[in-house]
Amino acid sequence: MASLAPFFKISDSILADESFDDLEINNHFKCTSKDLNEYPRTSTPLPGEITSIYSLPRSYNNQNLCTRSKPTTFISQNQQKGMTEKPKHSEYFLRLMKTRQEMQKKLTAKNGSNKSVQQYLRKLPPSTSKEVTIIPVKMKPDDNSVYISKELSDRTDTKLPKVSTKEVEKFGEQSDDEERHERSHIASDFNQKTPQSTHATSNHRKRIFIGRTGAKQQHVSKKATESELPYNIDVSTSNTTNATEALKLLKRPLLLPSKDPRSSKMPRLDLNQHQFRCKQYIVHSQFTCTQIEKTFKCRVGTSTESEDLDDYYFDAMPDGKAPHFPQQPVARQNDDGSLELECFVDANPTPQVKWYYDNKEVENSGRFSANLANKGSDSYSAILTIKELADADAGAYRCAIVNPHGKGNANFNLKLTGFSSPTFVEKPQISSRDDGQVMVMEFRAKSILEPTFVWQKLVGGGAEEIIANSDRIKAVKKLEAGNVYYSALEIKEPTKDKDAGQFICTVKNESGKLTATFTVKFEVPEGAPSFTRKPQILQQTSAGGEPAICFDIGYSARMNPQVTWISPKSKKMKESSRIKFKTNDEGNGNFTAQLELTNYKAKDSGTYTCNIKNDAGEANVELTLNIEGPLDDYADDSEN
């Protein structure tokens, strides 16, 4: 304001003089008045607050009111209006004030405001302005390890309490212009003084290995679709590791700028950042670290002078290894239908493992069980087992592994897009009941989706579908507990001619099928009746000279076999004038059985059965007679 006083005193002459050209940015202007030569010419705006744009017109009018009796050249009304209306349209604003305000904004953004910074720093002792910035760390080529130079020194303070690493938070980076503006803003509110701390430093330097930082990520897609297992599973897996090399703060900083509401965290030493944040403060400048046994002392200040530095103590992390996934996670199904999610990890010390399903922790229960197994050295295997897998088990699973050196996550995305083909719970087998009168082919299969059962018999190299639920054959299907189905084929009075061979049952659902195969063999016990040749129907003449039909059967048997003939009406036949039975012993256990039918008529047509039985077993053979002609009445020769 003092430097602008001459300008206001002669403002009347400046505006009235015809030789007045313009005002320049750097306060240089052309005028014929000699008094103006006393106005200081500067290359930059002077410090201090810029006068209001209304000051010049107001001073000008007041001066004219006081000297109205003197001959004075007044400015016109339009000219006065141009200086007194809104600032952005006034001539004074456009010529001088607007230009100076633009310059002031640029300088404020670069160096801070004149009022807040320059005046405040005149009163503030230099030692009370403390700033900290972490030195960028250089990385070696093709190496994930981080190295930093540190000074060795002796620790002079006593044991200090530790602070948990959970209070650590990274703040980020700022450009140079943003840092200058941030320092100016913070310094405006800093109003406390703290004495400096003393320290001792050694000149010996040593290069110290800190550890591994950074993150690795792997993605793999795996699909398990085994036809013999009860599920088709689509599993997407990924690994993420984040190993943080941090130094835990032991002593709270003493000299720090105040009032930054963005964080209430304690400081953390992160080797890859230029700033760190600590409890309501942001600090950034330069620092040096000194190793004292297993503790690091950080010297912080605005200059390299030792008297301007403050000491902060950080506890070095113990030796060990952050969690690392050496291979891809695995998802597999067991024969019992359970699902296992397994991830492999290298860590030291032993990590803590937690499993999450849709971001909710999975607790050990009847269906879920978690296990961590040591595979030797620092290798571990974390397994989550899911029993009785159901539709509701699909979703996102996460294995969270953490130890003091870092943490890692293995992600599983389980999709049950469809269930696999049925599986055997009980293998196929053949049994009998009702004293061998019923043959049963049965098995049990498990299927989540309801299956269909189709029974077939191989005939002549092909497959013939069996008609179920007939008088002699019956198919059985029954649902039991746990999605288990029982299926059986029951055959009454099975015979070698009809029922020997291979039977197939196909179990099918929307995802696949299962085939059960049965082989039926009829084994004749020693001495049991068996047929030695193909039965024959012969046309001949009886002993009385009458036309006759003879059913001739050859068989072998021991232990006095008995022969029984069954008529087409399923009745036991007896001898009569028209029916004669003959049995001839041919030796070596071979026999011939004959049924002679004389005076045969059309009504004698039908299927006749010869049953041969002894203590070792029995055998049956059927013969079909077809006689053409009128159906005359004849006597019934069967037993009542």
From Swiss-Prot:
Keyword terms of this UniProt record: Cytoplasm, Disulfide bond, Immunoglobulin domain, Repeat
- Bias (Basic and acidic residues) occurs at 154-186
Query: Where does this protein reside within or beyond the cell?
Result: Cytoplasm
Q: Which residues form the Ig-like C2-type domain?
A: 323-417, 422-521, 529-626
Keyword Cytoplasm, does the record have it? yes
What is any Pfam family matched here? I-set
Which parts of the sequence are annotated with region: Disordered? 154-204
Domain of life assignment: Eukaryota
Name the residue ranges with Polar residues bias. Answer: 189-201
Q: Which GO terms describe its biological process?
A: cell adhesion
Known InterPro entries for this protein? Ig-like_dom (IPR007110), Ig-like_dom_sf (IPR036179), Ig-like_fold (IPR013783), Ig_I-set (IPR013098), Ig_sub (IPR003599), Ig_sub2 (IPR003598)
The protein's role, per its UniProt record: Stabilizes the attachment of the myofilament lattice to the muscle cell membrane. Isoform b is sufficient for wild-type function.
Q: What is this protein called?
A: Disorganized muscle protein 1
Record organism = Caenorhabditis elegans
- Identify the coding gene: dim-1
